[in-house]
C-alpha cells in the first residue's frame, strides 16, 4: 500500500472559532442547508458524534457520488483541529483503501482564518495518485467552504 499526502490551504474573513463551530462542529446540519444539491444529509451510524463515530454522508443530485462513510479520528475544540478518515463509498474508487484528513484552523493576521488541510491517500497496491486526480475533490471542498463562509457573512449572529 502506498500513501500519498497533499496539503491545501484556504483563507477566510471569518474568525477561526466561529468557522470551526460552523464548518466542523455543525457541518452535518449546515452543509445540507447551504449546499442541498451537493450533500443531501448526514447520518450517525455508530457513536455519539465524538472520536470513533461512524457517519454516512449521502450526496445530492448534483454529485457524481452516492455516499461515503467516514470515521471521526479526532476533535480538539481548544486547538481548532479535526481529523477523520473516509472508510467506504464510491468516492474511494477501486484503487484507494481510505483517505485520512487532518484539518486545522488558525487565526490570520487580519482577524480571519487560515484553514490547513492535509489529505493522506492510502492506495491499494503500488497505485500512484496524481495531483490532477485530487484536484476536482479539492475544488469541490473549496466550493463548500465558500458557501459556508457566505452563509456566515449573511448571518453574522450565527455560531457566536
From Swiss-Prot:
It comes from Prunus armeniaca (Apricot). The lineage of its organism: Eukaryota, Viridiplantae, Streptophyta, Embryophyta, Tracheophyta. This is Major allergen Pru ar 1. Keywords: Allergen, Pathogenesis-related protein, Plant defense. Belongs to the BetVI family. GO terms for biological process: abscisic acid-activated signaling pathway; defense response. CDD domains: Bet_v1-like (cd07816). Signal peptide: none annotated. One of its GO terms (cellular component) is nucleus. One of its GO terms (molecular function) is protein phosphatase inhibitor activity.
